[in-house]
From Swiss-Prot, chain B:
Family to which the UniProt record says this protein belongs: Belongs to the peptidase T1B family.
EC number: 3.4.25.1
Protein name in UniProt: Proteasome subunit beta type-7-A
Keywords (A to Z) from UniProt: Cytoplasm, Hydrolase, Nucleus, Protease, Proteasome, Threonine protease, Zymogen
Location within or outside the cell: Cytoplasm; Nucleus
Organism: Arabidopsis thaliana (Mouse-ear cress)
Catalysed reactions, semicolon-separated: Cleavage of peptide bonds with very broad specificity
UniProt xrefs under Pfam families: Proteasome
Record's function text: The proteasome is a multicatalytic proteinase complex which is characterized by its ability to cleave peptides with Arg, Phe, Tyr, Leu, and Glu adjacent to the leaving group at neutral or slightly basic pH. The proteasome has an ATP-dependent proteolytic activity.
Superkingdom field: Eukaryota
InterPro entries linked to this entry: Ntn_hydrolases_N, Pept_T1A_subB, Proteasome_bsu_CS, Proteasome_sua/b, Proteasome_suB-type
Gene Ontology BP, a term: proteolysis involved in protein catabolic process
Signal peptide as annotated in the record: none
Top-level enzyme category: hydrolase
Length: 246, 273
């Protein structure tokens, strides 16, 4: 007879009886923030290509933004294997939907709703998919941008960010985002946010992709890196005038 | 075998006697009391002629705003000011203490205080308390060797930086600095950038709020701009004003004088040997 101890919340992990060890307790390979904004023609989403294994930068070529069907982009931060699982679920969903062969296709709102249900139900069973997902898309001329977290919190907004992006990128977006940004302005704004994240998030790497979705379809850019500036005189000689300090 | 325990007065510094008891209690499940934290955004930046320090003005006690307009920029010396984040009592006490020490030092040496003196005094104190004095400080000033800006962490480590942020709103403020800081800012550009970063903390962090305080220190001159910006004014004031209950009526006035003091001189008996 398996004894079931009431799970006590201890920060990130959950203590349970040994027999039931098939639940996600903590993430292993993780992706860092995603930043996304609505712009004039659709949605822009930026992410870097790093996958960290704890404090090691293990994988430097992970695409964390994928196209879903014709109308949506899904970006994920958190556990990479759970993201791949979600992509499989969405594959099945879009395949089943295709088989109806009625000319309809799943739009971003529908996929967002599906993902919300999946994440919330998994969380209710104490077996979460350890991701924060960003869903952006355009259907029938209307752009859509939403977010689902691993506990099932879901909402829509004009600009979203996950993980560290919440603290570092959102203040910039709240100040400088406005409706009907042009493509160039949108990319500049995203790059501004990604640069701050690069300076201040330890798991960020300088290799990012920006994905764009419009009524015409999805384009994911080639990976590229941002220019950084390290030439402040105080950085060169921090103890000038304060000899012996650090 | 004599069991004499002489009470030796503690030699000063932190007394670790109760730590074992506290450990035992936490293992039994007792939660330690939490501190009044300032939940803050404090920033400093070096511009062309000196240093600009900025701070918000909200002090929180858990989820409640305890003080809507507190002062987080503390005076250390005429040419040195220090912003404090963390436990309010700790920041007040430690900056006050070092401020007095600096004053005495000024009398003794006959010279203006230097920023690294304040830095070393603070750092030594905080390190010896192993992080239990929960004060995170942004120390800035202009002395004979030039403008300086340092951050001091509760465990006693320090950084020397061109721009710095501390407190719960530090990430929001740092994102503004990282995006917009340049070297050689003028006074007005510097004040604008500091105000922008404090506002970023005020509007994006729940632990920071109310107004922006700014302090500009240059060679031989300092300006303490208390409530430089008030982006959260009270917009609704009821036009009805306050109405108290109906007039109080005086029913009775009675004055009872205190009893007269009576001196009793007793002729006591002489003490027996």
């Amino acid at each position: 007879m398996t004894t079931f101890t009431v799970p006590i919340d201890n920060g990130d992990s959950v203590r349970i009886a040994e027999e039931e060890s098939q639940r996600t307790l903590y993430p292993y390979v993780t992706g860092t923030s995603i930043v996304a904004i609505k712009y004039k023609d659709g949605v822009l989403m930026a992410s870097d290509m790093g996958g960290s294994y704890g404090s090691t930068l293990r994988y430097k070529n992970i695409e964390r933004v994928k196209a879903i069907g014709k109308h949506s982009l899904l970006g994920a931060s958190g556990e990479i294997s759970d993201f791949q699982e979600i992509l499989r679920y969405l594959d099945e969903l879009t395949l089943n939907d295709n088989m109806w062969d009625d000319g309809n296709s799943l739009g971003p709102k529908e996929i967002h709703n599906y993902l919300t249900r999946v994440m919330y139900n998994r969380r209710n069973k104490f077996n979460p998919l350890w991701n924060t997902l960003v869903l952006g898309g355009v259907k029938n001329g209307k752009s859509y941008l939403g977010m689902v977290s691993m506990i099932g919190v879901s909402f829509e907004d004009d600009h979203v960010a996950t993980g560290f992006g919440n603290h570092l990128a959102r203040p910039i977006l709240r100040d400088e985002w406005h409706a009907d940004l042009s493509f160039e302005d949108g990319v500049k704004l995203l790059e501004k946010c990604m640069r701050v994240l690069l300076y201040r998030d330890r798991s960020a790497i300088n290799k990012l992709q920006i994905a764009k979705i419009t009524e015409e379809g999805v384009t994911v850019s080639q990976p590229y890196s941002l220019k950084t500036f390290w030439e402040f005189s105080s950085f060169h000689n921090p103890t000038a005038g304060a000899e012996g300090s650090w | 075998m004599s069991q004499s325990t002489v009470d030796v007065p503690p030699k000063g510094g932190f007394s670790f006697d109760l730590c074992k008891r506290n450990d035992m209690l936490t293992q039994k499940g007792l939660k330690a009391p939490s501190f009044l934290k300032t939940g803050t955004t404090i920033v400093g930046l070096i511009f062309k002629d000196g240093v600009i320090l900025g701070a918000d003005t909200r002090a929180t006690e858990g989820p409640i705003v305890a003080d809507k307009n507190c002062e987080k920029i503390h005076y250390m010396a005429p040419n040195i000011y220090c912003c404090g984040a963390g436990t309010a009592a700790d920041t007040e006490a430690v900056t006050d203490m070092v401020s007095s020490q600096l004053r005495l030092h000024r009398y003794q040496t006959g010279r203006d205080s230097r920023v690294i003196t304040a830095l070393t005094l603070l750092k030594k104190h905080l390190f010896s308390y192993q992080g239990h004095v929960s004060a995170a400080l942004v120390l800035g000033g202009v002395d004979i060797t030039g403008p300086h800006l340092h951050t001091i962490y509760p465990h006693g480590s320090t950084d020397t930086l061109p721009f710095a942020t501390m407190g719960s709103g530090s990430l929001a403020a740092m994102s503004v600095f990282e995006a917009k800081y340049k070297e050689g800012l003028t006074r007005d550009e510097g004040i604008k950038l500091v105000a922008e970063s404090i506002c970023s903390g005020i509007f994006n962090d729940l632990g920071s709020g109310s107004n922006v305080d700014i302090c500009v220190i240059t060679k031989g001159n300092k300006e303490y701009l208390r409530n430089y910006m008030e982006p959260n004014p009270r917009t609704y004031v009821s036009s009805k004003g306050y109405s108290f209950t109906k007039k109080t009526e005086v029913l009775l006035t009675k004055i009872t004088p205190l009893l007269e003091r009576v001196e009793i001189t007793e002729v006591g008996e002489a003490m027996e040997e």
